[in-house]
Amino acid sequence: MNFPLIANIVVFVVLLFALAQTRHKQWSLAKKVLVGLVMGVVFGLALHTIYGSDSQVLKDSVQWFNIVGNGYVQLLQMIVMPLVFASILSAVARLHNASQLGKISFLTIGTLLFTTLIAALVGVLVTNLFGLTAEGLVQGGAETARLNAIESNYVGKVSDLSVPQLVLSFIPKNPFADLTGANPTSIISVVIFAAFLGVAALKLLKDDAPKGERVLAAIDTLQSWVMKLVRLVMQLTPYGVLALMTKVVAGSNLQDIIKLGSFVVASYLGLLIMFAVHGILLGINGVSPLKYFRKVWPVLTFAFTSRSSAASIPLNVEAQTRRLGVPESIASFAASFGATIGQNGCAGLYPAMLAVMVAPTVGINPLDPMWIATLVGIVTVSSAGVAGVGGGATFAALIVLPAMGLPVTLVALLISVEPLIDMGRTALNVSGSMTAGTLTSQWLKQTDKAILDSEDDAELAHH
């Protein structure tokens, strides 16, 4: 073991201990996460300045930090399936009639796809506005290696899925395999399976009340139990964020970021426009955008740092029910669907931007209205199966680009700035699903106005 490596690990452990002292304070989770975020950025910058992003010491150190960072993300992935299963099951079992189920899913999914369609258009717009193209981005050895890795990872799962097959892959044939997250579309399959189970519980309640009551009591117990598990993992968020931010900041190559600067700026401009679109949609439907963003801010910061839409599901549901007055049934649906269907950032904005950048290299005019219409259509439809765990955007791009007959090499070239942009995209995905839930709740006139209008915001889960 070399000395610098040990020193880095010691400093990291000291930072974790320092962060652990915040548990004695009456701080909200959002505040602790913010402290972790700042510490991670500062520590990451220090490491970057001392060692430079390519040094072996730094790479070795990051592997140790990953125990905390990636370990945390894996714990989040651990709770996603039980959470989606329990939330949807209890949400459906609480509906008094199964006909509401159709309405809720139709409106939620409709809103998600509609916002993704707008996001794709915004992506086309900003990319053309900045005149970004893939020409002149050099493919070095590192990129080629990355491309091969990406292709072997994803392409087998994606490229042979046509749209009908994609839709078919949502329907669960082995719910236990889907609970293991075996397929990219597992989350949706679990949602469908849980919804069926919930409807069956309602039918049972009608036909045989005592048994039905017992099943519903069991479902409620399961839901409370899983939520306790979720809170446990949530308490680790600040530490995970500290480690993840250290890794992103220390390992990001400044030359790459400057070289791809216009892409980063264009991406964030597109993201800001989409946040404005969410605000406008809410405003039209009687929810003050400022109030909405103030109330969901902790969830967005969490999504931003964790870079996982699926991992944000627990906080997402909490914010909708306890701050925006959305009933639990709608909130659980919007959060679970939103982690897979119609992610505005990862599956809407990003693939559209990439397609517009690649088009000129193969002699397609990216301003051609027919081409744009086809692109937006394909992006919207294929956004239905992007798994909500980090790297979903790469996945979306690998569905959209081949479908448009475009090469996928650009995906590898942009990977160096991927984490930087992915943070903003994930926040947008999560805002999209909360917007869908809030709008659905408004349309069905089920919003609890007292909660929505209250100025003091319920503290989001952290005990």
From Swiss-Prot:
The chain crosses the membrane at residues 1-21, 33-53, 73-93, 106-126, 185-205, 264-284, 347-367, 370-390, 395-415. It is a multi-pass membrane protein. Involved in L-cystine import. Low affinity L-cystine transporter that is mainly involved in L-cystine uptake from outside as a nutrient. Is the primary transporter at high concentrations of cystine. Probably functions as a proton symporter. Can also transport D-cystine, cysteine and homocystine as a methionine precursor. Mediates accumulation of the toxic compounds L-selenaproline (SCA) and L-selenocystine (SeCys). Can also transport S-sulfocysteine and is required for growth on S-sulfocysteine as a sulfur source. InterPro entries: Na-dicarboxylate_symporter, Na:dicarbo_symporter_sf. Belongs to the dicarboxylate/amino acid:cation symporter (DAACS) (TC 2.A.23) family. Inhibited by L-cystine and L-cysteine, and to a lesser extent by D-cystine. Induction: Transcription is controlled by CysB. Highly expressed in sulfate medium and repressed in cystine medium. It catalyses: L-cystine(out) + H(+)(out) = L-cystine(in) + H(+)(in). It comes from Escherichia coli (strain K12). Its main location: membrane. The gene is tcyP. GO terms for biological process: L-cystine transport; sulfur amino acid transport; sulfur utilization. Disruption phenotype: Disruption of the gene decreases uptake of cystine. The mutant cannot grow on S-sulfocysteine. The tcyP-tcyJ double mutant is unable to import cystine. The tcyP-tcyL double mutant cannot grow in the minimal medium containing L-cystine as a sole sulfur source. The tcyP-tcyJ and tcyP-tcyL double mutants are completely resistant to both L-selenaproline and L-selenocystine. The keyword Cell division does not apply. One of its GO terms (molecular function) is sulfur amino acid transmembrane transporter activity. The keyword Transport applies. This is L-cystine transporter TcyP. It is found in: Cell inner membrane. Pfam families: SDF (PF00375). One of its GO terms (cellular component) is plasma membrane. Keywords: Amino-acid transport, Cell inner membrane, Cell membrane, Membrane, Symport, Transmembrane, Transmembrane helix, Transport.
